[in-house]
UniProtKB/Swiss-Prot annotation:
The gene is panE. Its main location: cytoplasm. Pathway: Cofactor biosynthesis; (R)-pantothenate biosynthesis; (R)-pantoate from 3-methyl-2-oxobutanoate: step 2/2. Its EC number is 1.1.1.169. Belongs to the ketopantoate reductase family. Catalyzes the NADPH-dependent reduction of ketopantoate into pantoic acid. Coiled coil: none annotated. GO terms for biological process: pantothenate biosynthetic process. The lineage of its organism: Bacteria, Pseudomonadati, Pseudomonadota, Gammaproteobacteria, Pseudomonadales. It comes from Pseudomonas aeruginosa (strain ATCC 15692 / DSM 22644 / CIP 104116 / JCM 14847 / LMG 12228 / 1C / PRS 101 / PAO1). This is 2-dehydropantoate 2-reductase. NADP(+) binds at G7, A8, G9, S10, L11, G12, R35, N103, A129, R131, E262. InterPro entries: 6-PGluconate_DH-like_C_sf (IPR008927), 6PGD_dom2 (IPR013328), ApbA (IPR003710), Ketopantoate_reductase (IPR050838), KPA_reductase (IPR013752), KPR_N (IPR013332), NAD(P)-bd_dom_sf (IPR036291). Substrate binds at N103, N186, N190, N200, S250.
Length: 303
């Protein structure tokens, strides 16, 4: 069965290259004919590992391609996910499966609601990759991907193909708890790196601010029924800051480069969820307002 991959960014390209070199059938879906022509001129996807580049001539097409889609990896940004999924909805088989590889929360639920006949699996990944040019991606850090389905805990048989492709993964019966934990870590770190214009390690100068945010995030996780995700949150945030002290957060990099952030699916989603629960989150709300004002000042979308 063919893997269709929509989203030729860093993680989508990384998955496509590894699945393709394992001999599995893969097709990239590119947004329009102009993008397809540029891909064909490049000759395929380039994957750089340990300083060595390899070219993988993965087949590619546009969303209006004719072949039915049985399995789709959606690897675009959270704010593009629903529209991207809709662009190929007419091609989805009746029992199609979608693997949603988005940051934060909210986009996955929107896609699942838009495509009720399809099985939507959520994913949370710690793998590191970045684009080094058009259709060229650098594998920057080995990590792990957890996959799960909030509505069905039965793992699909095709997970063996991920092992065949050398993609470290685990099936998770509590994927939402994992995604909430990752969201909380992001909310405690990334917005502050933007507002203080610092590397992750610079947040060591703001321990009270970090502690106050973790306290509210812990309240939100407990109120949402994710007690395990709230456990040792502050300690883990400090550990992430120490382990990545020399790095700029992904949100800081987006803002610096004038790119839209995924704020609406991270800090924005946390604040909206608190409102739905009737849970006051004054520190998180203030942080969101400060970050939105900062983004508007730079001419960037604030949601």
């Amino acid at each position: 069965m063919t893997w269709h991959i929509l989203g030729a960014g860093s993680l989508g390209s990384l998955w496509a290259a590894r699945l393709g070199r394992a001999g599995l059938p893969v097709r990239l879906i590119l947004r329009d004919r102009q993008r397809l022509r540029r891909y064909q001129q490049a000759g395929g996807l380039s994957l750089v590992e340990d300083g060595q580049a390899s070219l993988y001539p993965i087949a590619a097409e546009t969303p209006d391609g004719g072949q039915p889609i049985q399995r789709l990896l959606l690897a675009c940004k959270a704010y593009d996910a629903e529209e991207a999924a809709s662009s190929v909805a007419h091609r989805l088989a009746g029992n199609a499966e979608l693997l949603l590889l988005q940051n934060g929360l909210g986009s996955q639920q929107a896609v699942a609601a838009r495509l009720p006949r399809s099985r939507c699996l959520f994913a949370s990944s710690t793998e590191g990759a970045f684009r080094d040019g058009d259709f060229r991606v650098v594998f920057a850090g080995r990590g792990h991907t957890w996959l799960g389905d909030p509505r069905d805990t039965n793992a699909p048989a095709w997970l063996t193909q991920l092992s065949q492709a050398g993609i470290p993964h685990s099936w998770s019966d509590d994927i939402l708890e994992r995604l909430w934990r990752k969201l909380a870590l992001n909310c405690a770190i990334n917005p502050l790196t933007v507002l203080h214009d610092c590397r992750n390690g610079g947040l060591r100068q703001h321990p009270e601010e970090i502690a106050a945010l973790c306290d509210e995030l812990g309240q939100l996780l407990h109120a949402s029924g994710y007690d395990a995700a709230a456990r040792s949150l502050l300690e883990d945030v400090r550990a992430v800051i120490d382990a990545t002290a020399a790095n700029y957060s992904s949100m800081h990099q987006d803002v610096t480069r004038g790119r839209r952030t995924e704020i609406g699916y991270l800090l924005g989603y946390a604040c909206q969820h608190g409102q739905r629960l009737g849970l006051p989150l004054p520190r998180l709300g203030t942080l969101l307002a400060r970050l939105q004002a900062h983004l508007r000042q730079r001419g960037l979308p604030d949601r």
